[in-house]
C-alpha cells in the first residue's frame, strides 16, 4: 500500500489532500524520509487521519516528527455517521483529541455500559450511541463498537463530543485496528 502511495505521489498528479490511518501515515512519512523527502515536500498540504489508535501522544508525534508543516486533523467516523471532526488540538491542550459528530446528520451520545438510555457525565467513560437522520435514512440509538469519554461542547461545535475513542471493551479482544 505504501509503494502505491509513493508511486501516486511521484506521478505529478498535484495531490494535496489525503485520508489515512495513523499507522499508514507514519509508514508513508518514514518511507518518504528514507527517500530524502517529506509529506509536505511530496505536495500534501492537508491530511484527514483517523482510527482508534489515534491518541494524543501519536497526534503530538505526528505534528512534531512527521508532517513537516502539513495540516492534519484527527477524524472519527463510519458510513452511518459520516466524518466527525476534532476540536482544535495542539500544545495548548496537550494534543487532546475530542471529536464532534457532523450534526444535524448524526448525533452521538456517550452512554452507560449497562444502561444505554443513560448518558454519562462529562469526563466519564461510556459506549458510543449513534443516531443518524438523513432524507433517506433514520437509525435511532445504534450502539457503536467504540467507547470513550464524554466531552462538553466547545466553541466550534456547540454539542457534546467524545475523546479517548477506543474499541468497546466487550469487543476489544477481537477487534483489529489500524488498516480499514
Regions found by a protein language model. Name each.
Residues 1-180:
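Active-site glycine/GP-rich loop and adjacent strand/helix microenvironment
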